[in-house]
């Protein structure tokens, strides 16, 4: 084992001198024994000459001093993978943080792995049902595809991702991996407790590097989660679900260390390597002819600006986008999905079928027409509209409310029982509203219900 010495510490960035035997390779893990007996992992980032490397620390650098010995492990960070990580909670370097003792895993993977070769990639397009009306109808998710949930602060990204975990993990008996990247520790704790209660925990591996962690951990924890998912895909030939909350924090962590590594910032102060870092992560989240990785990623939108480089870079990699809108959240419609801004590559009659496609397009055109009329309504009022437009507005407002839905994970807040709506019920319900079967029902009957039958029942009580 090569041994070096710490020569400089600048926050999370540590420089190490290696006198003889050459330098560790880029991305190799180095370890430092702390005075309290714990081990700190550093990741090599740059060679600063013939004897010095610059590294990023995966944990706080408190207590480190110059001259401390550093050992080169000779390989990148290795994390435990396999069936034994299910039901466990790990940190970025694969150490357990759930207090249940060490993970007894026979195999470990590097967190930096090559992308699968082109000839083994799968090109199948198939929709998978989430039980959430607005998603299944207007921006269906594909099995083995990548989906992004975009939204500013406090519009419901984490609640939506929790609901998806709840619906998908319970309905489909596959394995899931959850990577908590730079988000609130409280939310991670809630998820852990909720999973234990619902019994989903035995099929899930959780990897956390939350807000309180140094940027090195936040920049790498998504890769740790991905390596665990890749094991199930490649060696057990399974369909795996990978949830990442939040991809923006991955970019943000990269930007935090970029300047300390001596790089010139690029647009809006982000790291110049933004596109490469995002590409290296997203390019590994693929499906092969052995198994699939279906990923759902929450993506924070700084100041509600979708053109910010961080969300804009993520957009290009996704198969479906669910955009959460503050204006819809203000109307009290949850999930606050913007039906006109959200997209999906598989909303195609050849994949989802003609009925689904036509219903989705009819819903979108009604909502678009309502949006166009809103200026007239605001200035002149409803009375100035033609009878046809009044009917359009009435149906569009019903559709808007029918796109809301009570969530299982939000039962404590709404006091309403969560609903899982099957795709055929979703299509049937929206078709009936478009065809005018429910023109006589009040708008409020459609708010926070599951199927159209529930809306009819609710109308009787109003």
UniProtKB/Swiss-Prot annotation:
It is a peripheral membrane protein. GO terms for cellular component: plasma membrane; proton-transporting ATP synthase complex. ATP binds at residues 151-158. Its EC number is 7.1.2.2. The keyword Cytoplasm does not apply. The keyword Iron-sulfur does not apply. InterPro entries: AAA+_ATPase, ATP-synt_VA_C, ATP_synth_F1_bsu, ATPase_a/bsu_AS, ATPase_alpha/beta_chains, ATPase_F1/V1/A1_a/bsu_N, ATPase_F1/V1/A1_a/bsu_N_sf, ATPase_F1/V1/A1_a/bsu_nucl-bd. Its main location: membrane. It is an enzyme of class 7 (translocase). One of its GO terms (molecular function) is ATP binding. Keywords: ATP synthesis, ATP-binding, Cell inner membrane, Cell membrane, CF(1), Hydrogen ion transport, Ion transport, Membrane, Nucleotide-binding, Translocase, Transport. It is found in: Cell inner membrane. It catalyses: ATP + H2O + 4 H(+)(in) = ADP + phosphate + 5 H(+)(out). Pfam families: ATP-synt_ab, ATP-synt_ab_N, ATP-synt_VA_C. Produces ATP from ADP in the presence of a proton gradient across the membrane. The catalytic sites are hosted primarily by the beta subunits. Belongs to the ATPase alpha/beta chains family. F-type ATPases have 2 components, CF(1) - the catalytic core - and CF(0) - the membrane proton channel. CF(1) has five subunits: alpha(3), beta(3), gamma(1), delta(1), epsilon(1). CF(0) has four main subunits: a(1), b(1), b'(1) and c(9-12). This is ATP synthase subunit beta. It comes from Chlorobium phaeobacteroides (strain BS1).
């Amino acid at each position: 084992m090569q041994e070096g010495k710490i020569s400089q510490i600048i926050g999370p960035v540590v420089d190490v001198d290696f006198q003889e035997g050459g330098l560790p390779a880029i991305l190799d893990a180095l370890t430092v024994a702390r005075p309290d007996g714990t081990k700190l992992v550093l990741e090599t980032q740059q060679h600063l000459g013939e004897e010095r490397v610059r590294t990023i620390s995966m944990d706080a650098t408190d207590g480190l001093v110059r001259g401390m010995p550093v050992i080169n492990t000779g390989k990148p960070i290795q994390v435990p993978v396999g069936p034994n990580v299910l039901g466990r909670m790990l940190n970025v370097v694969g150490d357990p943080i759930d207090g249940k003792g060490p993970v007894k895993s026979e195999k470990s993977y590097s967190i930096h792995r090559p992308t699968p070769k082109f000839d083994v990639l799968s090109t199948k397009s198939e929709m998978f049902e989430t039980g959430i009306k607005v998603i299944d109808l207007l921006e269906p998710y594909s099995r083995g595809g990548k989906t992004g949930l975009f939204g500013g602060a406090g519009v419901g990204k984490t609640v939506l991702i929790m609901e998806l975990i709840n619906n998908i993990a319970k309905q489909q008996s596959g394995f899931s991996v959850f990577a908590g990247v730079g988000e609130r520790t409280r939310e991670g704790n809630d998820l852990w407790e909720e999973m234990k209660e619902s019994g989903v925990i035995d099929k899930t591996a959780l990897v956390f590097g939350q807000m309180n962690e140094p940027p090195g951990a936040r920049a790498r924890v998504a890769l740790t989660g991905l390596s665990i998912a890749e094991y199930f895909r490649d060696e057990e030939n399974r369909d795996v679900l990978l949830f990442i909350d939040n991809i923006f924090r991955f970019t943000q962590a990269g930007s935090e260390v970029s300047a300390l590594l001596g790089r010139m910032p690029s647009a809006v102060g982000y790291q110049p390597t933004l596109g490469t870092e995002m590409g290296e992560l997203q390019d590994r989240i693929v499906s092969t002819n052995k198994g699939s990785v279906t990923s759902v990623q929450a993506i924070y939108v700084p100041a509600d600006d979708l053109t910010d480089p961080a969300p804009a870079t993520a957009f290009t990699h996704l198969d479906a986008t669910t955009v959460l809108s503050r204006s819809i959240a203000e109307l009290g419609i949850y999930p606050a999905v913007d039906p006109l801004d959200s997209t999906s590559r598989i909303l195609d009659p050849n994949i989802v079928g003609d009925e689904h496609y036509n219903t989705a397009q009819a819903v979108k055109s009604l909502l678009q027409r309502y949006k166009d009329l809103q200026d007239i309504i605001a200035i002149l009022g409803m009375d100035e509209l033609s009878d046809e437009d009044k009917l359009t507005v009435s149906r569009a407002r019903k559709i808007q409310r029918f796109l809301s839905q009570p969530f299982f994970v939000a039962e404590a807040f709404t006091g309403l029982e969560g609903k899982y709506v099957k795709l055929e019920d979703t299509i049937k319900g929206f078709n009936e509203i478009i065809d005018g079967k429910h023109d006589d029902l009040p708008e409020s009957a459609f708010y926070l219900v599951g199927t159209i039958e529930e809306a009819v029942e609710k109308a009787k009580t109003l």
